[in-house]
Structures are given as structure tokens and as C-alpha cells.
Amino acid sequence: PIKPHWHYFMEIIYIFEGHAEVRSGSTVISAGRGDMALFHPKAVHSIFSDSPDDLRYGVIKLDINCINMTAENAPKFRSIFSFAEQRGMSIYFDNAQTEAIEASRIFENCIKEMQVRRYGYNDIIRSDISCLLVGVLRLWQESKFTIDSEVFADDGVYDIYNITEYIEEN
């Protein structure tokens, strides 16, 4: 079991085998094979096996501040995901949704790249994580989530916020 904790990073888990009770804040999810959950930065979350079967899942923990789209005119991932959190977008994605965004392949490839660590592995992992994040955004868009001017307005706010957070930590 992973007891309740939080950190400054985003975390995404993908269930490969078994069944788990996944909690984030007041949200409780019963997740099985092929399901995925996203924990926003600073969200208190936990994971407990809720079946006698072995639980096996992959974890991607990332600093959302360090992954951005390349287009200058695109809002930063951190602003989009913060906006989605404020709008209460689902942090749970079922097997059909994860198949649509190829989450299993992405997780397996990231794990393989981390194990082998051949030249450029970090670039491949960053690319795969970007694909996963865009996939999540597209799933949210199917649920009427829109990326509008409010998201762009937050880009500068988070720059100042991150600087003050860094100063506070040090």
C-alpha cells in the first residue's frame, strides 16, 4: 500500500494487473487492469490493493513545469492542467479511454527506456510523456473541456508562483 502523501509533482499511474482503491483528495476510484489515474501536484493521494490478486502498476512522476509544448503560442501544460483541476476534470480514465490514447504502450516504453538507458532515452521518455498528456487533454475535450484565453492568462502567474515556491523551499 502507498499511504496518503503529497508532493510537488504530477503523478500518473497505470494498472497493469490486479485491482486497487485509488484516492486523491475526496475522490475514491476503484481501478482495475488498463485503468489510469492522474494526481495533480500537491494533491494528497494513496493507492491500496483491494483484491487478493497481485497489484502491478506503472508510475510516471513528473514536474509538469518542465514539460511544455513546443509552439510559442500554445499555453504551458502546467497552466492547462491547473485549469483542468480547477474545473474538476476527471482524474480517472477507464480501459477504453487508455486504449484510445495508447497509455499501456507509453508506460511500457518509458519503463523500457529507463531500464536500458541508451543514448537519447530521456528525449524519448519526454516525448512519450508529452503524447500521454496530450492524450489526456483530448479525452477531457471530449467531455467539453476547452482551452481558452483563461488558460493563457495563467502562464505568467505560475512563473512567479514557482519562483516563490523555490525560495520558500530553500
Locations of the language-model features?
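Short intrinsically disordered, low-complexity coil segments enriched in acidic
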Residues: 1-6, 14, 38, 59, ...
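Residues immediately flanking
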Residues: 17, 41, 62-64
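Short, Lys/Arg-enriched, Trp-marked, Pro/Gly-tolerant hinge/linker segments that flank
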Residues: 91-99, 114-127, 133-170
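Generic protein-terminus/edge-of-domain signal
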Residues: 1-36, 43, 51, 74-79, ...
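A hydrophobic/aromatic-rich effector-binding and dimerization subdomain
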Residues: 48-112, 138-143
